[in-house]
Amino acid sequence: MSKKSVAQLSAADLEGKRVLVRVDFNVPVDEKGVITDETRIRAALPTIQDLISKGAKVILVSHFGRPKGVDEKLRLTPVAQRLSELLHKPVAKLDDCIGDAVIAHTQAMANGDVCLLENVRFHPGEEKNDPEFAKQLAACAEVYVNDAFGTAHRAHASTAGVTQYLSPCVAGFLMEKELEYLQNAIEHPRRPLAAIVGGSKVSSKIGVIEALLEKVDKLLIGGGMIFTFYKARGLNVGKSLVEEDKLELAKHLETKAQEKGVELLLPTDVVVADNFANDANSQVVSIEAIPDDWMGLDIGPASVKRFQEALQDCKTVIWNGPMGVFEFDQFAKGTEAIARYLAELTSQGVCTIIGGGDSVAAVEKVGVADRMSHISTGGGASLELLEGKQLPGIAALDDA
């Protein structure tokens, strides 16, 4: 499923062309509207700079937050200001993303100019993938580049609908890197291939666990979902989080792992607390000895060691989801130890892929983000790609 990339378009293909680039500028801001993490803006720079250098007229489009109609707090003005500083050139922020004023501005652009359209989610037609809205959005451009992997699993006007009206439609550098790492890890991995799946609920990771059992050599499970597996085995889990309606499923997944010859590892010890708080009393216990009124909030030190030993000979490791409640420092040790160990494995030539969401926050918190092979920018999108699903935003691009 390899897709055509912006790298394959030359200056001759792009010079003087108006290029609509779907980026992901959905950055976190504080109550004053100041950007607190500009990672997503920086991640889009290689594609934007490449288009500028090839003489294109760059028209950026993104969503920001979840507005219901126009919301003054969710205008993209601060993003345009920061982008302008990073690019060392002016970035015009337009007042809308469709309409005559937008078309007039984009037609008057010089080669190498950059503008940012207003928050595309101010229009309900974006999330509905309304063909009429998609047509109006595409009217300002000729070529389409999608560099927003984080929204590739959504069939929206700016990720899928506009491709009906623009050509060529290609992947940006960020999108290309995501596809290269995630698809290779699943389709042509260097083995042994291990996946570490964490998070609190089995229900949100069923699809990915089922799909991974078809592909991996080892599956390590941590996070709150382990207690559903323990309860299914008949163990007492105290007040730990359990999805009662998923007990049969947990049994099925363990059986499936055996049938497929996949080594499925669950923690052997856990850190339990007497309540859900950072300052709770805690102790390390074996999974057979969880006290009645206590709840498990992290994997224990023996499990960390066991997980590290299991990963030692692996050549590819995919990690999605924390090992415990890592927002509380007291219960972050399991997650942090795994993050550090993966950084160590990367330095020994192992391909390590951090698949979106909380695991990205975890490796950033530990300060080892730059030591991983690849950090996925899309939470839901990377999960769906690992599940083997077709993502609308990727399917809509031209094949290589």
UniProtKB/Swiss-Prot annotation:
Source organism per UniProt: Thermosynechococcus vestitus (strain NIES-2133 / IAM M-273 / BP-1)
HAMAP family for the chain: Phosphoglyc_kinase
Reaction catalysed by this enzyme: (2R)-3-phosphoglycerate + ATP = (2R)-3-phospho-glyceroyl phosphate + ADP
Pfam family, one: PGK
Alphabetical UniProt keywords: ATP-binding, Cytoplasm, Glycolysis, Kinase, Nucleotide-binding, Transferase
Organism phylogeny: Bacteria, Bacillati, Cyanobacteriota, Cyanophyceae, Acaryochloridales
Annotated protein name in UniProt: Phosphoglycerate kinase
Principal subcellular localization: cytoplasm
Quaternary structure, from the entry: Monomer.
GO BP term, pick one: gluconeogenesis
Molecular function GO labels: ADP binding; ATP binding; phosphoglycerate kinase activity
